[in-house]
Amino acid sequence: MKIAMIGSGAAGSVFAAYLRKGGAELWLVDKYKAHMDKIAADGLVFRTPEGEEVLTGFHTSATAHDIGTMDMVILMVKATQTADVMADTMPCIGPETVVVSLQNGLGNDEVLAQFVETDRILYGSGLIGTELAGPGVCVSKPEKGIQMHFGAVHNNPKADAAGKALEACFQAGGCNASFDEDVRPYIWKKVIANSGYNGVSAVMRLKVKETFADPYGHDIVMHVWKEGCAVAQALGIGDLWPLMEKEEPNIVANLGNYYPSMAQDAVLHQRQTEISVLNGAIARYGERLGVPTPSNTVITKVISCIQNNYDKQYLG
């Protein structure tokens, strides 16, 4: 199976490593030239809790324009970049190519549907901590149990066959992936969790464990989660609150010492965040369904104001 990984940073490289170990032929597409050049010259160093190995045989490119038609294209760019990246990726997408989003947030499948038919779109999310330790070096910190869930936007023979093939390839490479008939509960669970610790930590400029340890921070996270669960239930996805309650100690244990990605974007690097597909998406769905989401709405507005005014902020 010929697969293009569009966006081969930390998560994209880790996912590609598992797929390469599972037997896929991989094209890594990323504008990070030093990373692509290092992989092309020396292979990809892949570190996991079990040890380190060097994986070879990758094709690398800064663009999808000249890599030929793929069997599958996996998007691993920031959700805010999906439309622009898809426009650039179309040269390698043929009439039978299956397009997969394993990105953060809600609505990526809707953006993909602007470019290809929904019967060949898969979407989902991973539960794997990842790191790019340097050019050509990626690190996987997998969760226990199933590490990745994905499914079809519309179940049909083509999408189901592609999903099962992707599941088998991930599993053969050591990633415990699951192709699910209805992937929405897993996507919403991750989005709700992210909207809590990511959004609140970004506003507070705190690590995850510090946000949860402070009674006010913890209270805000719980409000964000409860609103997200109410929206999910209104969509017919089910009651996710019991799952979120069980998830809290795992989040603190596994992510507690880190500034989450939104805090890194907003505080450390002054980059555009994914607020619009996390808290912002929950708020939009809530408005559409008549479900109040005051905490998610306020956090969305605060982060949006911050990222709209990086050049004007007082730095001391």
Residue ranges and their predicted role:
Residues 1-52:
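NAD(P)+-binding Rossmann beta1-loop-alpha1 motif at the extreme N-terminus of oxidoreductases
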Residues 17, 21, 87-91, 114, ...:
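Short, well-ordered alpha-helices that flank and scaffold nucleotide-derived cofactor binding pockets
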Residues 29, 53-138:
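Rossmann-like NAD(P)(H) cofactor-binding subdomain of soluble oxidoreductases
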Residues 93, 137-152, 202-211, 259-268:
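Helix-loop-beta segment of a Rossmann-like dinucleotide-binding subdomain
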Residues 104-186, 190:
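Rossmann-fold dinucleotide-binding core
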Residues 184-212, 216-229, 256:
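Active-site-proximal catalytic alpha-helix in oxidoreductases
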Residues 218-316:
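NAD(P)-dependent Rossmann-like dehydrogenase/reductase catalytic/cofactor-binding core
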